[in-house]
UniProtKB/Swiss-Prot annotation:
PANTHER family per the UniProt record, alphabetical: SAD1/UNC-84-LIKE PROTEIN-RELATED, SUN DOMAIN-CONTAINING PROTEIN 1
Compartments where found: Nucleus membrane; Nucleus envelope
Top-rank lineage group of the source organism: Eukaryota
Protein name: Sun domain-containing protein 1
Biological process according to GO: centrosome localization; embryo development ending in birth or egg hatching; protein localization; regulation of centrosome duplication
Membrane-spanning residues: 262-282
Annotated organism of origin: Caenorhabditis elegans
Length: 473
């Protein structure tokens, strides 16, 4: 029988057998085999022909099954191809088995749902059967629970005893609180009763004080009248007696007499109400901007942050030190002063630092004084005009020089004045005022501007004291 070899020398992994040709062992082509494959059905009587069998009919009339692996391996593949195909068949067989196992043992979603429902149904049946079975044994367990409760009876008794003790303590505390509250209520009632009595006594004392105040005011008015009468009588009797004694002073110029808008020598006409010691102050919002009394760029620059020296212009003192003054660079310098009391003005004065012979530079030379009728002196009334501060020829250097205010019968009381400096000595750009004074007779403030006090007696008493001081002066 001739051998069959593949046309290609390479191994073939195809499932269908390759095309072959008959070759002899010596390499000579053999004639085509006359055997032909025949396909036939098993046609035995009584059998079902469900399969088709293929047979190979050789020349010697022997039949070989074409479906057998032996025929395929022997007739169509070489030895090497057969061994390689066997190896591949082993791997294919293993893969096939794994797939079969997965198909059989790995459930699908439908199988999983059916299994889950079966498990849940089984669990429900088990629970129902267990409840039915162990229902009778529940009473026995209650007996065991009673035995366990008996063991904890002593501890329960202790717990209840502690609770009862706490309740007793709370009740005792409540009783103490009630007792203390009752005691405090009684004390409060007693205090209220005493306070009512104290209020009544205080009201009576206030009434007595008001009566005393009225008596004191009447007495003061009588004393004022007596003093005025005494002054008038003294002046009448003293003028003819002192006429010859005043002969040496006849050489004084007529400007030295006490007349309006003229300089006087020394005249104390009332109380200085422009004194910071009794409450007077500078109204900076309506005054010129203050600067340092010292000259220099540094002091001018620091004056923007405050000089702290301008208050000396209202500090009534005997000795004036250099530098303790209110100064400004304004050409029309204005100094607004809030007086300590409402007064009827009689005179004003100015005093510079100690000088001799010549008035120092920066000192005011010519100034006016007006009475402010509103808060910032936009409305005003003239008091003194053209008041001059200067040296005297051949006479004593007066450090404080006065200017009297003309007397007006219906002059209203004032508490704001403004000094308007028009000229200074030396024609310097800076004007410095060391000490200004405003003399007058303190009076009661107007009714529309009278401040309310605690008991209505403070302002009257203060005014009475100031009046008495002015009269004694």
């Amino acid at each position: 029988m001739a051998l069959r070899h593949t046309i290609s020398p390479q191994f073939s992994n195809r499932h269908s057998p390759p095309v072959t040709r008959s070759v002899s062992r010596t390499g000579v082509h053999q004639p085509l085999d006359t055997s032909t494959p025949v396909t036939r059905r098993d046609s035995q009587p009584g059998t079902i022909t469900g399969t088709i069998q293929r047979f190979h009919e050789s020349a010697d009339d022997s039949e070989i099954d074409l479906n057998s692996s032996k025929f395929i391996y022997k007739e169509h593949f070489s030895y090497k191809e057969i061994t390689s195909m066997k190896k591949e068949m082993w791997y294919d067989w293993l893969e096939y088995r794994i797939r079969m196992v997965r198909r059989r043992f790995v459930p699908t979603w439908a199988q999983f749902k059916r299994t889950l429902m079966a498990v849940v149904l089984f669990a429900m049946l088990y629970k129902y059967a267990r409840d039915c079975l162990f229902d009778g044994t529940h009473h026995n367990s209650e007996g065991s629970y009673a035995d366990k409760d008996a063991n904890w009876a002593s501890e329960k008794q202790k717990f209840h005893q502690t609770i009862s003790n706490l309740r007793a303590e709370f009740s005792a505390h409540d009783k103490q609180l009630d007792f203390k509250t009752d005691h405090l209520e009684k004390l409060l009632e007693n205090v209220l009763e005493h306070s009512k009595g104290w209020k009544e006594s205080a009201i009576e004392e206030l009434k007595q004080i008001k009566l005393w105040q009225a008596e004191i005011s009447d007495a003061l008015q009588q004393m004022k009248k007596e003093i005025d009468d005494a002054k008038s009588t003294k002046i009448i009797h003293s003028t003819p007696e002192k006429a010859p004694e005043t002969a040496p002073t006849a050489s004084l110029p007529p400007s030295s007499q006490l007349q309006p808008m003229h300089i006087t020598r020394r005249a104390l006409l009332g109380v200085n109400v422009a004194n910071s010691l009794i409450g007077a102050s500078i109204d900076h919002s309506c005054s010129s901007r203050p600067v340092s009394a010292k000259d220099g760029f540094f002091y001018d620059f620091m004056s923007y942050f405050g000089t702290f020296q301008e208050g000396y212009a209202l500090l009534d003192r005997d000795v004036l030190s250099p530098g303790e003054a209110w100064c400004t660079y304004d050409k029309r310098a204005t100094l607004t002063v809030k007086l300590a009391r409402f007064v009827i003005p009689k005179s004003v004065s100015y005093q510079h630092v100690r000088w001799s012979g010549i008035v120092p530079n920066h000192a005011p030379k010519l100034y006016d004084v007006v009475a402010c009728t509103d808060s910032c002196c936009t409305k005003w009334q003239p008091l003194v005009a053209n008041c001059e501060y200067k040296e005297r020829d051949g006479s004593y250097d007066e450090q404080e020089q006065f200017c009297s205010v003309p007397t007006i019968q219906n002059h209203s009381p004032i508490n704001h004045v403004q000094f308007r400096f028009r000229e200074n000595h030396g024609d310097m750009p800076k004007t410095c005022a060391y000490l200004i004074r405003v003399y007058g007779e303190p009076v009661d403030p107007p009714k529309e501007t009278q401040p309310m006090t605690d008991n209505g007696t403070e302002s009257k008493l203060e005014s009475a004291i100031v009046n008495s001081v002015s009269e004694t002066a």
